[in-house]
């Protein structure tokens, strides 16, 4: 696929989501492709055919990324709506949804967001610490200020945007590892309960930190202009964490299930076999932590479904991403979305 075709697919996807083509797809209704530049109708297509094309292209290439831009603008921070700001696009992974372009003061903005991710696998170690999330938000505020102070003139638009809104993105990793540590299956009501509990806690503490820092250091200019007491315009964003999850001891990435219970990690230093530590602990208890067993798991793409010495409950706990009903990922995403003021980078795993 050419770069032009990829670009066209991304534009179609954004227009498609903005005007809710998915509602019309079930009825084979006509769908207008509307230019975001001037609002003119460039073409009318069958909604179902467009949806099918998007799904097939995404399955084959991983693209286009789908962003609900109408929802993003409707749910942006209240003071940004009052200022008439608009989100036109996201970053590549689609978790950063900040205003760009000419703002209400006639200045051009380039979005800037400082990110950090909490390790949910270690939830029990930090959730009771009242200062923990506030300290992280202070750290992000300091990083943002350092960027504002030191950014070169060539980054004037980004520097201006960072100064005006001071947006940060607190995210997570290790959700599936936490569930496995607690012997909880991903496809379970208890996983749903933990998902809600964790994000309600993180969101509430991030909101508290924004107020505390606004009182201590002053609200960001965008908020101050409308009388809002917020240090950060945006506070949360669920970003992919493939690399930092490895740094954090191999915890599960982001909010997603693990792809395999054993895999080969290739680095510049060589190739290393990585095993799921919670599964290894279970196998050891059953006296099954052997090379033959692990090789059989590896041969089956990291799945334990074939191991007859595991109970159905144990197999459910160690299901891999492609074995899990993807509707659970969508349900969890919907449940946590009210607590996230930017967006979630969410992958679906379709075999």
Task: List each model region and its residues.
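Long, C-terminal-biased catalytic regions of enzyme "large/alpha" subunits
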Residues: 1-351
């Amino acid at each position: 696929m050419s770069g032009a075709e990829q670009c066209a697919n991304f534009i179609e996807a954004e227009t498609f989501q903005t005007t809710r083509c998915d509602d019309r797809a079930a009825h084979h209704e006509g769908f207008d492709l509307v230019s975001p530049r001037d609002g003119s109708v460039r073409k009318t297509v069958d909604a179902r055919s467009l949806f099918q094309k998007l799904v097939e292209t995404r399955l084959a290439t991983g693209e286009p990324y789908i962003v609900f831009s109408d929802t993003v603008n409707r749910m942006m921070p209240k003071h940004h709506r009052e200022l008439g700001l608009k989100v036109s696009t996201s970053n590549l992974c689609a978790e950063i949804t900040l205003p760009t372009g000419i703002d209400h003061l006639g200045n051009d903005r380039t979005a800037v967001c400082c990110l950090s991710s909490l390790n949910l696998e270690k939830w029990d170690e930090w959730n009771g610490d009242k200062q923990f999330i506030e300290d992280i938000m202070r750290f992000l505020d300091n990083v943002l200020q350092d960027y504002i102070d030191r950014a070169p003139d060539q980054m004037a638009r980004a520097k201006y945007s960072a100064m005006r809104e001071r947006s940060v993105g607190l995210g997570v990793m290790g959700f599936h590892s936490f569930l496995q540590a607690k012997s909880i299956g991903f496809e379970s009501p208890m996983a749903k309960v933990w998902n809600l509990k964790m994000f309600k806690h993180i969101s509430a503490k991030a909101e508290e930190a924004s107020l505390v820092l606004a009182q201590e250091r002053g609200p960001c200019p965008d908020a101050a202009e409308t009388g809002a007491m917020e240090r950060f315009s945006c506070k949360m964003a669920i970003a992919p964490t493939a690399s930092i999850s490895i740094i954090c001891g191999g915890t599960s990435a982001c909010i997603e299930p693990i792809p395999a219970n054993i895999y080969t990690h290739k680095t510049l230093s060589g190739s290393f076999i990585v095993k799921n530590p919670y599964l290894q602990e279970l196998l050891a208890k059953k006296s099954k932590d052997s090379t033959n067993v692990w090789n059989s798991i590896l041969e089956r793409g990291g799945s334990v479904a074939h191991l007859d010495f595991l109970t159905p409950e144990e197999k459910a706990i160690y299901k891999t991403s492609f074995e899990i009903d993807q509707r659970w990922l969508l349900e969890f995403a919907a449940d946590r979305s009210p607590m996230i003021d930017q967006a979630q980078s969410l992958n679906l795993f379709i075999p």
